[in-house]
Amino acid sequence: MYHVYLLSDATGETVERVARAALTQFRDVDIRLRRMGQIRNREDILRALDEVDRAPGIIFYTLVNTELAQFVRNEVEARQLEAVDLITPLLYKLAEFLEMRPQKLPGLQYEMNSEYYRRMEAVDFTVKQDDGQEPRNLHKADIVLIGVSRSSKTPLSMYLAHKGYKVANVPIIQGIDPPGELEEVEPERVVGLIIDTQRLVDIRSARLRNLRQSPRGSYADYRQVEEELSYCRRFYRAHPAWLVIDVTNKSVEESAAEILSRLHGDIRHD
């Protein structure tokens, strides 16, 4: 049996993928991979190399800290072990090409991957909770946006989702009770959106024109819209712990920044 040791200052997933890719070129060989992650200091290195001494094999390592990488090189030479540094030559070449020094942050790639998947999970959640869908999941949302039709609930939800927040949005419709689950959501997670009457009329009229429909119906009628917004304000006043923001003439980015600023410290990621 041949032993291959994989040393990393992060999880070791990257060095293992590289090793496995190379080993596919050598079939019918009995190889044992031993992954050793979270190598952060000299003591960790010495413990790992002591294990290699007991069952000698080749070492592949990825240590972005150049001092630790040099310590490994010195130790394996002194112990007469076989080792391959998979990342330092690459870092030097990139530093030369980009004319800048690399960030020596162990696990940076893993953290970036984790952040990416967290955001994708937030986007997936938010899409499924759009426009009042699946109200049973409201308690799982980091933020719950509520408001009348065309008050920027969906674009705001998606913008926040791409920042990693799980967002649900619920329409407020005069004459129709919101889902009971809304009352069970922690009030500091609920954000009510309000907008100027004429601005909302203009937005709805433009929407109808885009759909090749007449803007003369009640959906874009000034008095009807005014009644909807009055009902919405009364509903918000009945819940004084909710945050209410005016989105009139604000970009999605501006509204999102205001929400995050005013909710700072109250939002948690589950």
UniProtKB/Swiss-Prot annotation:
It is an enzyme of class 2 (transferase). One of its GO terms (molecular function) is ATP binding. The keyword Kinase applies. It catalyses: N(tele)-phospho-L-histidyl/L-threonyl-[pyruvate, phosphate dikinase] + ADP = N(tele)-phospho-L-histidyl/O-phospho-L-threonyl-[pyruvate, phosphate dikinase] + AMP + H(+); N(tele)-phospho-L-histidyl/O-phospho-L-threonyl-[pyruvate, phosphate dikinase] + phosphate + H(+) = N(tele)-phospho-L-histidyl/L-threonyl-[pyruvate, phosphate dikinase] + diphosphate. InterPro entries: Kinase-pyrophosphorylase (IPR005177), PPDK_reg (IPR026565). ADP binds at residues 147-154. Keywords: Kinase, Nucleotide-binding, Serine/threonine-protein kinase, Transferase. Its EC number is 2.7.11.32, 2.7.4.27. The keyword Kinase applies. Signal peptide: none annotated. Belongs to the pyruvate, phosphate/water dikinase regulatory protein family. PDRP subfamily. Bifunctional serine/threonine kinase and phosphorylase involved in the regulation of the pyruvate, phosphate dikinase (PPDK) by catalyzing its phosphorylation/dephosphorylation. This is Putative pyruvate, phosphate dikinase regulatory protein. The lineage of its organism: Bacteria, Pseudomonadati, Thermodesulfobacteriota, Desulfuromonadia, Geobacterales.
